[in-house]
Amino acid sequence: MITLNLPSILVPLVGLVFPAIAMASLFLHVQKNKIF
């Protein structure tokens, strides 16, 4: 049962967390290198 439910939990988790981390790192990178 756990092995059957694991992908259904991991797929949305990876699908939501990975883009969030990518967007946050990109945002911080842009903020750090922004020239005023």
UniProtKB/Swiss-Prot annotation:
Topology with respect to the bilayer: Single-pass membrane protein
Taxonomy, superkingdom: Eukaryota
Keyword flag Chloroplast: yes
InterPro entries per record: PSI_PsaI, PSI_PsaI_sf
Keywords: Chloroplast, Membrane, Photosynthesis, Photosystem I, Plastid, Thylakoid, Transmembrane, Transmembrane helix
Spans traversing the lipid bilayer: 8-28
A biological-process GO annotation: photosynthesis
An example Gene Ontology CC term for this record: chloroplast thylakoid membrane
Disulfide links within the chain: none
SUPFAM superfamilies per the UniProt record, alphabetical: Subunit VIII of photosystem I reaction centre, PsaI
Record localization: Plastid, Chloroplast thylakoid membrane
Cited HAMAP family: PSI_PsaI
Function: May help in the organization of the PsaL subunit.
Similarity remark: Belongs to the PsaI family.
Entry protein name: Photosystem I reaction center subunit VIII
Native organism: Vitis vinifera (Grape)
Recorded name of the encoding gene: psaI
